[in-house]
């Protein structure tokens, strides 16, 4: 077919035809009547051609990623695409010659895939149902178009059908062999009908083959022989190959239009090239999805394992802490138990028991009974008297003897004598002996030195014989000088007998002693009475005589405890039963 078309072009050149498009432009440019008639036909075909051209270009961007699909569906999808595109093309009415030619042209077009263009190495199919595998089934992609002859009165403007396809320089996915394709633009112009002007029709088809192994794509068009009455306009065959960038001679304005469309579409075709990586990247993402899920599962497993390890470590630490805590508590309890057991065994063992003080026990037993015999006494007397004497009895090595002064008014004379005697006997009850008793009222008129000697003999004899207590009644009635002997027995550091008790009684000159009197007041009353009795300004000062200084020393040694005694009616009436 290609050889036939080339031979026809040679014959037409030999017969005197130059460039129909150029000649028609020159003639029509000089004829104003033709120019006015040519304006209308130019607009409609141009718009139609643009619709035919721009629509595939937009489809080119959308369907570029579908290149390289199944090969067996190429022919069928081509037929469906052609049938869908034909209503969109608005062609002028055909004359009889074209009607006779159209069946063969349609048959030829059905054998080729419509709107299939090859540019720069990639095959682009504008049919949305066309799959990429069709490239593998077909060896050649053919684009064929029939150009319709202009109607009567058509001017120099001819239809320029420019079909542009561009593809990326990169090979499509699935291409196993690389190669360069040769692009051929073959067109034949339809014969002008009767009354046609000089204008001809030039169809410029640009076709570029894909990078499939060397195969050629052909653009073929059937041309009808020129009919009678044809003008100077002839047919323009433009053969544009991929090696040549400039249009051939005679292309005229149609060639420039094709070049412009080629430049625009080649620029727009670059974006599908970059977007062609989309399906591949999606497939890669799909292929990577299981890997990502596996990695995520692996990470989750690692996280769970780490959490379990942390929990186990926490449990270990808690167990260690609990062990240390409970262990320390148990150890502490054990130590406390051992200490308590040791203390209990220490105090409960017979060898370590503190020996009981029989003198103290006997005193406490006797002293507790005195409360019943001498009712009406102050609590101070019982508490302070028991505490003072008990302390002295508890001391294993006392530093001085226990000296107590009981005092009472005249109405409590018998009660004072009886109570002091029972207290002294209670103190010495453990020795099963009675206390030494000295009455100062009986020796009031005797010589001071004699009384002093007698008092010394009685006290020393009694203490030496086991009598641990002595009672000196009416201490205020003794001669003043004789009382100096008590320095010997009541000294703080150099007392002759330190483990004994001396009970002294002082009868006040007052008739009654109030029960509410305080211990301090009682002590002052006793002190004033002794100073009045033992210090006399008319008595000469001598070693054997009492003075205020000596009395002050004596008072400091005997006044450790001064207790008031209230009279008991029964004892005052009947006397003290010793």
Curated annotation (Swiss-Prot):
Residues 144-153, 186-195, 220-229, 241-250 have a biased composition (Low complexity). The gene is Tor1aip2. The chain crosses the membrane at residues 326-343. The modification Phosphothreonine is found at residue 301. Residues 1-325 are cytoplasmic. The keyword Ubl conjugation does not apply. One of its GO terms (molecular function) is ATPase activator activity. It comes from the Eukaryota. The keyword Phosphoprotein applies. Its main location: endoplasmic reticulum. Required for endoplasmic reticulum integrity. Regulates the distribution of TOR1A between the endoplasmic reticulum and the nuclear envelope as well as induces TOR1A, TOR1B and TOR3A ATPase activity. Glycans are attached at residue 394. It is found in: Endoplasmic reticulum membrane; Nucleus envelope. This is Torsin-1A-interacting protein 2. The modification Phosphoserine is found at residues 24, 104, 131, 271. It is a single-pass membrane protein. GO terms for biological process: endoplasmic reticulum organization; membrane organization; positive regulation of ATP-dependent activity; protein localization to nuclear envelope. Residues 344-578 are lumenal. Residues 1-14, 23-56, 267-283 have a biased composition (Polar residues). Pfam families: LAP1_C, LAP1_N. It comes from Rattus norvegicus (Rat). Residues 344-578 are annotated as: Interaction with TOR1A. Keywords: Endoplasmic reticulum, Glycoprotein, Membrane, Nucleus, Phosphoprotein, Transmembrane, Transmembrane helix. Residues 58-101, 108-120 have a biased composition (Basic and acidic residues). Residues 1-255, 267-287 are annotated as: Disordered. Belongs to the TOR1AIP family. PANTHER family: TORSIN-1A-INTERACTING PROTEIN (PTHR18843), TORSIN-1A-INTERACTING PROTEIN 2 (PTHR18843:SF2). Interacts with TOR1A and TOR1B (ATP-bound).
């Amino acid at each position: 077919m290609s050889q036939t078309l080339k031979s026809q072009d040679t014959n037409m050149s030999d017969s005197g035809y130059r460039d129909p498009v150029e000649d028609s432009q020159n003639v029509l440019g000089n004829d104003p009547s033709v120019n006015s008639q040519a304006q209308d036909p130019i607009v409609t075909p141009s718009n139609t051609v643009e619709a035919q051209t721009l629509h595939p270009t937009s489809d080119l961007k959308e369907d570029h990623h579908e290149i390289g699909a199944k090969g067996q569906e190429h022919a069928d999808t081509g037929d469906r695409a052609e049938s869908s595109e034909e209503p969109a093309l608005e062609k002028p009415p055909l004359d009889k010659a074209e009607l006779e030619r159209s069946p063969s042209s349609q048959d030829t077009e059905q054998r080729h895939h419509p709107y299939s263009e090859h540019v720069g190495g990639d095959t682009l199919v504008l049919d949305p149902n066309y799959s990429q595998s069709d490239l593998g089934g077909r060896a050649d992609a053919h684009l064929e178009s029939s150009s319709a002859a202009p109607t009567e009165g058509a001017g120099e403007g001819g239809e320029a059908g420019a079909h542009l396809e561009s593809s990326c320089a990169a090979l499509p996915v699935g291409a196993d062999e690389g190669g360069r394709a040769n692009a051929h633009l073959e067109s034949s112009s339809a014969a002008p009908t009767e009354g046609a002007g000089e204008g001809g029709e030039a169809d410029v088809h640009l076709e570029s083959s894909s990078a499939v192994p060397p195969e050629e794509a052909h653009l073929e068009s059937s041309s009808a022989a020129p009919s009678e009455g044809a003008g100077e306009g002839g047919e323009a065959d433009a053969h544009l190959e991929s090696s040549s960038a400039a249009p051939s001679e005679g292309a005229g304005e149609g060639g420039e239009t094709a070049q412009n469309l080629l430049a625009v579409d080649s620029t727009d075709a670059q974006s599908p090239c970059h977007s062609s990586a989309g399906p591949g990247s999606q497939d890669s993402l799909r292929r990577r999805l299981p890997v990502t899920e596996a990695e995520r599962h692996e990470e989750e497993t690692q996280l769970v394992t780490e959490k379990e390890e942390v929990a186990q470590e926490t449990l270990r630490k808690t167990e260690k802490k609990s062990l240390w805590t409970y262990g320390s508590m148990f150890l502490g309890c054990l130590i406390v138990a051992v200490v308590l057991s040791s203390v209990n065994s220490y105090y409960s063992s017979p060898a370590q028991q503190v020996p009981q003080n029989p003198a103290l026990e006997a005193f406490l037993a006797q002293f507790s009974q005195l409360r019943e015999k001498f009712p009406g006494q102050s609590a101070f007397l019982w508490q302070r008297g028991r505490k003072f004497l008990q302390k002295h009895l508890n001391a294993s090595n006392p530093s001085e003897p226990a000296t107590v002064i009981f005092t009472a008014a005249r109405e409590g004379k018998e009660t004072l004598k009886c109570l002091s005697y029972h207290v002294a006997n209670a103190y010495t009850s453990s020795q099963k002996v009675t206390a030494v008793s000295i009455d100062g009222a009986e020796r009031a008129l005797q010589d001071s030195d004699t009384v002093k000697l007698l008092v010394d003999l009685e006290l020393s004899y009694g203490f030496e014989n086991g009598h641990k207590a002595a009672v000196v009644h009416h201490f205020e009635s003794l001669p003043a000088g004789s009382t100096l002997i008590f320095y010997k027995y009541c000294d703080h550091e150099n007392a002759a007998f330190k483990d004994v008790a001396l009970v002294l009684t002082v009868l006040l000159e007052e008739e009654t002693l109030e029960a509410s009197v305080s211990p301090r007041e009682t002590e002052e009353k006793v002190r004033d009475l002794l100073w009045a009795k033992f210090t006399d300004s008319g008595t000469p000062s001598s070693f054997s005589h009492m003075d205020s200084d000596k009395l002050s020393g004596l008072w400091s040694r005997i006044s450790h405890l001064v207790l008031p005694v209230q009279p008991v009616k029964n004892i005052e009436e009947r006397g003290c039963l010793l």
